[in-house]
């Protein structure tokens, strides 16, 4: 059995590594802004004037401030968002 690679990990990693400013919309309508400092399976650490730990289950949408490209899967499929 092969391990299925997550789509969100490469996307979040590019945003973190390149320090791309993002807007994060929560399911309750709140809009947060900052740079992704770190993330794991359950949370994203967002840095602005303060650090905020955001649970992924509370997130509706993540919008980068610019176009980002990243690779997904073993075949190295190139994706632009």
Curated annotation (Swiss-Prot):
Coiled coil: none annotated. GO terms for cellular component: cytosol. PROSITE patterns: SM. Transmembrane segments: none annotated. Keywords: RNA-binding, Stress response. One of its GO terms (molecular function) is RNA binding. GO terms for biological process: regulation of DNA-templated transcription; regulation of RNA stability; regulation of translation, ncRNA-mediated. Residues 9-68 form the Sm domain. CDD domains: Hfq (cd01716). Belongs to the Hfq family. RNA chaperone that binds small regulatory RNA (sRNAs) and mRNAs to facilitate mRNA translational regulation in response to envelope stress, environmental stress and changes in metabolite concentrations. Also binds with high specificity to tRNAs. Homohexamer. This is RNA-binding protein Hfq. It comes from Blochmanniella pennsylvanica (strain BPEN). The gene is hfq.
